[in-house]
Curated annotation (Swiss-Prot):
PANTHER family: BLISTERY, ISOFORM A, TENSIN. This is Tensin homolog. Residues 380-442, 597-616, 638-660, 692-720, 734-754, 794-879, 1015-1035 are annotated as: Disordered. The keyword Endoplasmic reticulum does not apply. Its EC number is 3.1.3.48. SUPFAM superfamilies: (Phosphotyrosine protein) phosphatases II, C2 domain (Calcium/lipid-binding domain, CaLB), PH domain-like, SH2 domain. GO terms for molecular function: protein tyrosine phosphatase activity. It comes from Caenorhabditis elegans. The active site is at residue 144. GO terms for cellular component: axon; cell junction; focal adhesion; M band; striated muscle dense body. Residues 1083-1187 form the SH2 domain.
């Protein structure tokens, strides 16, 4: 009690402190217990997996708005990360804009405490089923705010739908859905929910049929209720249609209708207890919901009257109330014909307009935030409806105190700008319903929003307008204020023209309210304001006046910065004994490259409508000019994989100073960049100058100022589009090419000549100091020591080149391999070592963009040779930028590289060699390995920095030898691969003359062919490093989930997670056995569960195993292994105890078995598996590498695929087709056969003989008589189910066209169900047996077990 008192006191003080001026109230003990109970419950959006493909998101109605939005965003992000784009959300609660935007939810909601309509329930189940059938990974998410009852209804209905219609329903899934629904629809579930689920199940199974005739309600009788005053309200499709007078209940009370009330569809009854006094409120006694289309009526008299009797357990709210008499009943006297007079529903609504409106559900279709805005408007402008309310009260004979309590939105102080901001939706709120033609509007007391004023004096032609017009007499602040200029939209120019804004959540509107309240914002603050990316528009029309003011303010600040630029942006040169000064610009560059930098977490807007940061913002902003280019953010991604090499590569060079415009430069020869600069200054007369840090020549600084003032002043006179283009042009100029005269004039030519002379002298001094640099001299000495080793390896490589098998390097048109080529280029680079000028310029150009490998000609040697026209000093750039390919320690690459993990291979067995199609040309395998190696180096270049030439030359040696060794090791890859290698020339697989019949019994399968079940994989297709290399056919592409789990470089898309990052050489096993074939696709099943793994291995021999992704430990793997003996203390059973489970945990160094200290760390998952296939180590037994999928046998696979390839056909009798909507399964076949048989008996249809063929493409029907149709084809994706007649009826074949002697006279019936093209509904096609040797069961088994099984497997 002390804790409760303390909690109560703290709540009081919080109430007083947070809402000063309001009365502090006292919390009762009941309220305190309720609040404590709610506090103990989990708040926010909760995620619950009903099945592996059905998720429920729910949130209680008591959750605060802030907590709801935060948890909603978090839950949606988790689901999207787990399932990518394979999710779709159905919202069964009230529509909200934040749910639609964050989850992209489909609105299918209905009010709480009511059952959904049958139409809505059928639509949801059909959509769920269709979505799950589209892809095996598709996940359905059901969202509900306000409890789980509505989710439970949908789950239960979908469970019934699967039980009747679906073919691949799992017993576990059905049990999970049943258990979930019973938690909310069990003994305490509302009777109306159960009633509608029974309607739904009966309609699917065909036990009841839909009756679309209306019902006429004559009177309602209530018996055994306690004596109270009540009145009834009747809703049709949740719209109020009738309200009775107040009646005092007794033992038997009757509500007489003044005629008959016409009802059809979903009907909702409410019995409301009238208010006992004028100040008291009403309460609902009971409710009941039913559907007239599903009622089975039995007349009780000659007039056709029927009685629908509902007992206590069938009435909501009182079914479990012990205070109510158990004999309570409600009787509805109805008929299919109207009585003497029919009640006019419209008249009833007009007489009782107030009560039905306040108690209706018509506002449910509005979004919840829209409904809140509507309630605010009702509070703010209640004086508009004051007189109309009085008129309604006088016209209503029933006391207004009898109405129910309606939730009223929180009172909001009147503010004219609020309705204007949200006025775009007011036309949908039904505001006009409050102000009718006969309503009297009081005298106007102030400026009303345009959306409300247009309801008063709006023309007829504007009634259908979707968005409100902007009223001309609104004050300026009502339309927009100055602070709102920098937020994404501008009001329309014409006063009569509507404007449109993107939808935003309630939080966005709240932000805009706060921002609209800002006044007197200066232009400098506007210019420096960063616009959030979510507020920007992709297209903005002609800029308004405030746009120009922002541009002027920015340009003036730009000029001020230029006046100070020469002193702040001078280049620093170093000579012998000098230290290179660290510039602030390098910090900015590192911030761009770092993945966790601020610039990446908060990227600048890509559109011109975003904020432009001026030069006044920071000291180095002008140097980061490339960040102002919108394309930079469209292309930059720190985690993007390296791009494949283009046809031709352009190396851009440019200075890092804002004074020197840049231009693209193509290197066409192996020259020193200093020579290029000197030559360009003589030939072009560029007006560019660089100041000396030590000399500080004033004349050169003046030239800088004059040049830059002109360049930017010329730009300032351009349009905003040219201003953005200027940023790009400034990044694309260099001192080595002719100056773009768009940025210069003849008046600067004399100053440019002076700059040429000064620049030439400075560059010569730099080059002379570079020649005597001690670091360069020492590096040259070290590299010359390796020359002899290179010469010794040349002879061995040449000998290996001559010993290559036929059809390799020479056959592919490759040049002789020269390992010295790389060194010659490196030596040439050392003789032309670039100056700091060139290094600084190169660093300024890269900016952390994704690297691009060097191009290769089609006839290039497989060694890492640079293409013709590419300078050797390109290698020098690798040393100065971490985004360029760098040599690396080859411990990770040696014998452990997966070529197919980087490229997609196209295999054509008719070609003499395996080729890779990339960029429109064919590369041999040698060049393919070369490209793959280059791409791998780019992937790992960020973690490998080399500064010594010795390591660089050693890397060149390795690349030459590795490429040569890889080509030699792939000597079997160019063998001729033709179908004749596996099939005889006259094989039926290649050349079929006829389609075989359906197999009646299990016969001997066709001979085993690897191409039939293993996708063309064969034994000697090359070496496989670490079990993952192998031939090119042994791999799937990166997009295949079940491909090899071999990981390279710490990243893989083959599974949900990676098993290795960086590996330490001292603790990793590197020497792995070489395997001929990659078998990981058989033993690596990332998506299966623990139970599925047990079922897969239960009947397999010891040593059989499977690896899956662990669900309990994210990032880890689970190893399921079949052993020969159970663990100690476990009794033998059904075989599941023989399946042992081990956890493979990842670590920074690799993967290892958890809990096994004597186990080493393996660099990859494949390495662990293959090592344990040689020795058991800590496992109970050695792993046995599978030769086929453990889920199936090779014989089964080969027979299945061979039969599908050949197809099977026979002649049957086509009886007819029936549209069955979404029904499928045996129940569908039963009903369709009955319908078709009745049609044939009545002569409405004609049975004909057809040719029935089943193949991998689907089912094809050909009419043998050409009387009904010619040919019909049903795609394999459209076929859902096939089955025999459950009650085994017989069909008289003698009436069919094409019947002859020898055919079956009394034949059994069968059918298959297929989707109707371009529709979500199904059709059932019925057939009868015709040939004695081809029973219908053989056709059905072939469709289900061969065609549909293969479709599900693929």
């Amino acid at each position: 009690m002390a804790a409760a008192a303390l909690c109560c006191a703290s709540r009081k003080s919080n109430k007083y402190n947070n809402e000063a001026g309001y009365e502090v109230y006292t919390i009762s003990e009941d309220q305190l217990r309720l609040k404590q109970k709610m506090k103990d419950r989990k708040e926010g959006v909760q995620v619950e997996y009903i099945t592996s493909r059905l998720i429920v998101l729910s949130c209680t109605s008591e959750t605060s708005e802030r907590k709801f939005v935060e948890s909603l965003l978090k839950a949606s992000q988790q689901i999207q990360n787990a399932h990518n784009k394979h999710i779709r959300v159905w919202n069964v609660s009230q529509r909200r804009h934040d749910i639609s935007s964050s989850l992209d939810a489909i609105p299918f909601g209905w009010p709480s405490e009511t059952a959904p309509s049958l139409e809505k329930l059928c639509t949801i189940c059909k959509n769920l089923d269709q979505w799950m059938l589209e892809h095996p990974l598709n996940i359905a998410v059901i969202f509900c705010k306000g409890g789980l009852e509505r989710c439970a209804i949908v789950v239960n209905a979908f469970m019934r739908f699967n039980a009747i219609s679906a073919t691949d329903d799992s017993v576990d899934d059905r049990f999970s859905m049943q258990r979930f629904s019973e938690r909310f629809l069990g003994p305490d579930g509302p009777p109306s929910y159960k009633r509608y689920l029974g309607y739904f199940s009966s309609l699917l199974s065909g036990r009841i049929s839909v009756n679309s005739d209306p019902l006429y309600l004559h009177n309602i009788i209530l018996t055994f209720f306690e004596p109270i005053n009540v009145f009834l309200k009747i809703y049709e499709r949740l719209v109020p249609v009738y309200q009775s007078k107040t009646v005092a209940l007794n033992k038997s009370s009757k509500f007489e209708m003044d005629g008959s009330l016409k009802l059809r569809g979903d009907i909702f009854f409410k019995c409301i207890v009238a208010a006992s006094s004028p100040g008291s409120s009403t309460r609902c006694l009971f409710t009941c919901q039913l559907n007239t289309c599903a009622l089975e009526l039995h007349p009780i008299n000659s007039e056709g009257y029927s009685v629908v009797r509902l007992h206590k357990e069938e009435l909501d709210l009182i079914f479990n109330d012990k205070k109510i008499d158990n004999r309570v009943t409600v009787e509805l006297v109805v008929s299919h014909t109207s009585g003497p007079t029919t009640i006019a529903t419209a008249a009833v609504q007009s007489v009782h307009s107030l009560l039905p409106r306040n108690n209706s559900y018509e506002t449910f279709e509005l979004a919840q935030d829209d409904e809140t805005n509507r309630s605010r408007l009702e509070v703010e402008y209640s004086e508009i409806r004051k007189k109309s309310t009085k008129s309604s009260k006088s016209a209503n004979p029933i006391n207004n105190n009898q109405e129910e309590e309606m939730p009223v939105g929180p009172p909001v102080p009147p503010k004219p700008s609020t309705p204007i901001m949200n006025g775009e939706r007011l036309g949908e709120y039904g505001v006009g319903g409050h102000i009718g033609n006969g309503d009297v509007v009081p005298e106007r007391r102030g400026i009303l929003p345009a959306s409300l004023r247009e309801k008063i004096n709006q023309k007829k032609e504007l009634e259908g307008r979707a968005t409100p017009s902007i009223e001309p007499d609104l004050v300026g602040r009502d339309r927009y204020d100055k602070a709102s200029r920098c937020f994404s939209y501008v009001p329309a120019k014409s006063m009569q023209e509507a404007f449109e804004r993107p939808r935003r959540t309630s939080f966005s509107r709240a932000i805009e309210k706060r921002e609209n309240s800002v006044e007197n914002v200066s232009q400098e603050e506007v210019a420096r304001t960063e616009i959030p990316q979510s507020y920007q528009q992709n297209d903005i029309s002609t800029p308004a006046k405030w746009d120009e003011q922002v541009e002027d303010a920015k340009q003036s600040a730009l000029l001020e910065e230029l006046a100070r630029a020469p002193s702040a942006m001078q280049h620093n040169y170093w000579g012998n004994g000098e230290v290179d000064n660290v510039q602030v610009v390098d910090q900015a560059q590192r911030a761009v490259i770092t993945p966790t930098s601020t610039l990446q977490r908060r990227p600048k807007p890509p559109a011109r409508s975003g904020s432009y940061r001026t030069l006044n913002d920071d000291a180095y902003c002008s140097d980061m000019d490339e960040l102002c280019d919108p394309e930079y953010y469209l292309n930059y991604n720190s985690n993007t994989a390296p791009l494949p090499p283009p046809r031709r590569q352009e190396q851009h060079a440019g200075t890092r100073s804002v004074q020197l415009p840049r231009k693209k430069m193509n290197f066409d020869a192996v020259t020193d960049p200093l020579d290029d600069v000197l030559e360009s200054t003589k030939r072009l007369g560029s007006a560019y100058s660089v100041g000396d840090v030590r000399g500080g020549q004033q004349q050169q600084q003046e030239q800088h100022n004059a040049s830059n003032d002109f360049n930017f002043s010329n730009t300032l006179n351009n349009t905003p589009t040219d201003y953005r283009q200027h940023y790009r042009n400034r990044n694309c100029q260099s001192v080595t090419t002719p100056r773009n005269h768009h940025f210069s004039t003849p008046s600067r030519e004399q100053e440019a000549d002076a700059a040429d002379t000064w620049l030439s002298g400075k560059l010569k001094k730099v080059r002379s100091k570079r020649d005597i640099d001690p670091d360069i001299v020492r590096r040259r000495t070290q590299e010359k020591m390796l020359l002899e080793e290179l010469k010794d390896s040349a002879a061995n490589n040449d000998e290996n080149q001559h010993n290559l098998p036929n059809g390799h390097a020479r056959g592919a048109g490759l040049q002789n391999i020269d390992p010295l080529a790389e060194f010659r280029r490196e030596e040439e680079r050392l003789r032309n070592t670039r100056s700091p000028y060139g290094e600084e310029r190169w660093r300024g150009r890269m900016r952390g963009k994704p690297p691009t490998p060097p191009p290769r000609e089609s006839s290039a040697s497989p060694v890492n040779s640079l293409p013709r026209g590419t300078p050797a000093h390109h290698m020098d750039r690798q040393r100065h930028n971490q985004s360029v390919p760098l040599p690396m320690h080859h411990r990770q690459f040696d014998e452990d590289f997966d070529v197919n993990s980087l490229f997609n291979f196209s295999h054509d067995p008719r070609q003499q060699s395996t080729t890779l199609e990339r960029g429109g040309r064919s590369l041999s395998r040698g060049a393919r390995i070369q490209d793959a190696y280059y791409a791998s180096q780019q992937d790992l270049s960020a973690n490998n920095r080399f500064n010594s030439g010795q390591e660089r030359v050693a890397a060149a040696i390795y690349r030459a030898e590795t490429a040569h060794r890889d080509m030699y090791a792939s000597g079997t890859i160019n063998r001729a691969e033709t179908p004749g290698r596996y099939f005889p020339e006259n094989s039926a697989v290649l050349e079929r003359s006829s389609t075989p019949s359906f197999p009646v019994s299990r016969a001997t399968p066709l001979p085993f062919h690897p191409l039939l079940y293993n996708n063309g994989e064969r034994g000697g297709s090359g070496h496989a490093a670490g079990g993952g290399g192998g031939g090119h056919n042994g791999y799937s592409t990166m997009n295949n989930r079940s491909a090899s789990p071999r990981l390279f470089g710490g990243s893989s898309t083959l599974s949900r997670r990676s098993s290795v990052n960086s590996v330490d050489t001292s603790e990793i096993i590197h020497h792995h056995p070489l395997f001929v074939k990659d078998t990981s696709k058989y033993w690596y099943k990332p998506t299966i569960s623990r139970e599925q793994a047990i079922n897969m291995l239960r009947d397999k021999p010891p040593g059989t195993f499977v690896v899956r992704d662990s669900n309990s430990f994210p990032g880890a793997f689970g190893l399921a292994l079949k052993v020969s003996t159970p663990p100690p203390g476990v009794n033998p059973g059904d075989g599941s105890e023989l399946v042992r489970h081990f956890l493979i945990e990842p670590s920074p160094k690799g993967v290892k078995l958890k809990g096994c200290n004597n186990e080493p760390v393996f660099g990859s998952l494949s390495a662990l598996v293959y090592q344990h296939s040689i020795t058991a180590l800590a496992l109970p037994t050695k792993l046995v590498l599978p030769d086929f999928d453990p889920a199936a046998t090779p014989e089964h696979l080969s027979a299945t695929q061979a039969l599908l390839e050949q197809g099977a056909a026979c002649n049957v009798v086509y009886v007819g087709s029936v549209d069955v909507e979404s029904l499928t399964g045996n129940e569908c076949v039963k009903r369709s056969i009955a319908t078709c048989s009745q049609r044939a008996i009545n002569g409405d249809s004609r049975a004909v003989s057809v040719h029935f063929k089943v193949s991998s493409q689907g089912v094809t029907l050909t009419d043998n008589t050409r009387k009904v149709f010619f040919r019909r084809h049903f795609n394999v994706q459209s076929v859902i189910f096939a089955g025999m007649d459950p009650i085994e009826r017989r069909f008289e074949n003698t009436r069919a066209l094409g019947f002859h002697d020898g055919c079956i006279a009394q034949a059994r019936l069968f059918a298959f169900v297929a989707r109707i093209p371009s529709s979500s509904e199904n059709a059932c096609h019925v057939f009868a047996e015709l040939e004695p040797e081809q029973p219908g069961s053989a056709v059905v088994n072939f469709i289900n077990k061969v065609m549909l099984a293969q479709k599900n497997r693929s």
